[in-house]
């Protein structure tokens, strides 16, 4: 570990729990990242892409009708307005540029609902990189519009039939491919989890979310918000929002995990509050496990939060008490999804609706004037059929 330039741990969490064959690839990636962060040319190109291709800075919108309490202002950080429809475009552009700088010709990625796959495909099309996306066969069947989008942009989508044929199996196949091809390929991981240096790279390529929010807040209100709230699956949109506020003790950092059918049922995805520390996906982190230490399937109405572990920096922020992690059920997220659409004319991603649901709960109970910022991490186009089917089912029940 002495050869590393950055600390691979956040407290006891993180690390590089990978086969020896991948250590040179991770060390090479860390070196390239550190050098790129000090290279004005790289940073200029990254910021130019964010501004002129992706559409940054994104708006900070004060909701007009959403808040249930006149004392509480609810602002939305509008990552849903970003090209590609979600926060994922930020760090994908950063990693793809980094891969190009390293001389890689090919990108390997995994995807569940297809959002990360679509973001990766658009970055590869833009930068002239070959793109291979591993996707569980079940997800390929469920997410045909995103599969078509990826293929339309030139990506090769590879259905994975092993195991449960879902995201974790796609991750395994992508990692296996990378272990034999890292001389020419970069594995573009989709969240702030996995082995070092991925959690740090993803945070740094997402931190403009919080940096912009801070500047916009000071301009609009002349002060910082009382709380910033974001949903947490692997944790990339949340760490992007939190990073610039960690050293601002007056600002509460609140992450919202998916409570699914209820925290007291096996049908949830809240490892931070209800998991045990273990080794998974190349890192030491809280993990949903059964009594025998086997990984339990996570569950959420939103595919993007359906992850049995969480990024190591979130585990550390939780352990130290700097951030608080709450949860919202499927039903609460569905209610918030519909409420935002009806009250503000904005359809959020189901993932973001979890953060919104908790913000509404917090606002309702407030007795003093407060300003809350919710990271609206993505738009809800991808979720309209899921929500429509659920609401139709409830109506006919």
Swiss-Prot record:
The keyword DNA-binding does not apply. CDD domains: Trp-synth_B. Keywords: Amino-acid biosynthesis, Aromatic amino acid biosynthesis, Lyase, Pyridoxal phosphate, Tryptophan biosynthesis. SUPFAM superfamilies: Tryptophan synthase beta subunit-like PLP-dependent enzymes (SSF53686). The modification N6-(pyridoxal phosphate)lysine is found at residue 88. It catalyses: (1S,2R)-1-C-(indol-3-yl)glycerol 3-phosphate + L-serine = D-glyceraldehyde 3-phosphate + L-tryptophan + H2O. This is Tryptophan synthase beta chain.
